[in-house]
Amino acid sequence: MPGEEALGGSGDQIANFTSEQSLPIRWEGQFGLSTLNPQLTMAGRYLETYFTPKVLAAQQQYFGRSQNIPPQPERDALTEDENQFIQSRDSFYMATVSENGWPYVQHRGGRPGFLRVVSPTQLAFADYKGNRQMLSTGNLAGNDRVALFLMDYPQRTRLKILGHARIEDARKHPELVSQIAEPEAHSIVERVVLIEVISYDWNCPKYITPRYTAAEVQEAIAPLKERIAELEAQLRRQS
């Protein structure tokens, strides 16, 4: 099972915990999974979800034809590529939908791996104390659909994920908190967010501006700094 090492436990331990604590690894979501086309893989379902009649009409209007869903590899779960990409992110964006129909996008950040892959079709992350607005939490109480954007700016890579989310009270499930949160952060975890992935799609790199963290910049310029230090040492010896 992907993510077992990151979770610090075996797949059996995860399954037993969730079963005993009434936290199923899979659930049908508030709006159900039965509406999904069983003939399509996760990647195909992503396009099917968004290729609505209005979208197809817009494609026809501006490009002279509507797009078809291209053939997809036969895989209906997150693969090792997605697993590694997800668990190396230190941030992601999550969109929810409010009761009045307005979308809300929230930035989530943490150490690389804070978004856990707990099964081939499920993600989880700890929800810490914040500004108390409870926007995403409230939105999910009325509509469990979520859309995630995971960005790798240096490599200009983007993974998009759709799923159904549920929120569990951390106080009622300390064992789950211990599996997905850093030990020093257990006391500030208020909720655990579980996401059942229904589809995903990789984006092209066009228009993604490369951005780098301070650590990545330091790593890149380290050889230059070493060379500068060598040259300065040579100058001092010659003076």
Regions found by a protein language model. Give the residues of each.
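Charged/polar low-complexity intrinsically disordered segments
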Residues: 4-5, 12-13, 28
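Binding-site signature for planar aromatic cofactors or substrates
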Residues: 25-27, 33-239
